[in-house]
Amino acid sequence: MLDQAFEALKTFDFGTPLSDVQAIDDAAVAAHDDAEVRRDLEQRLIAALGLDISRDAKDYVCRKLALVGAAAAVPALASLLSSEENSHLARHALERIPGPEAADALASAATNLSGKLQIGAIGSLGVRGETNAVETLTSLLKERDAMVVRSAALSLGSIGGNESAQA
């Protein structure tokens, strides 16, 4: 059943009956009680992101990685951060994946991207409450782009703490 659901992802869009991918949803639920199921599902979802799948399928995969993803998923998600069409999908997952790898990917995007993509990455650091990003966010307060400065200030406020307040 799971193999069939992943096969259905290759042609998935939001008009596809959700029953076609129900086995993936079921595996995501089962993954909370079984580390082996979680790792297997995570690897399959990562592999799916590497395929030529629709934006809707990438959205679905990123939502599942937000539930079951760990450090192994970060490189695949980070590769989407520079895409206008997919950045927010990846950020949604990276905001929820615990660990420094996800935070580092977002911090890198916050300093290396520009425009809306950069602002989104900055905001995601605030959503995570990423105290390790305070130095990065503080440095962005000196940028010329007022929206970058505003986003960095808002994220620092979301993170809170003495170090953020002193920035």
Which stretches of residues belong to each language-model region?
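Catalytic-core regions built around general acid/base machinery
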Residues: 44
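N-terminal "cap/leader" segments of large eukaryotic alpha-helical scaffolds
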Residues: 1-21
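Structural detector for internal amphipathic alpha-helices that build alpha-solenoid repeat scaffolds
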Residues: 14-36, 47-51, 55-70, 76-79, ...
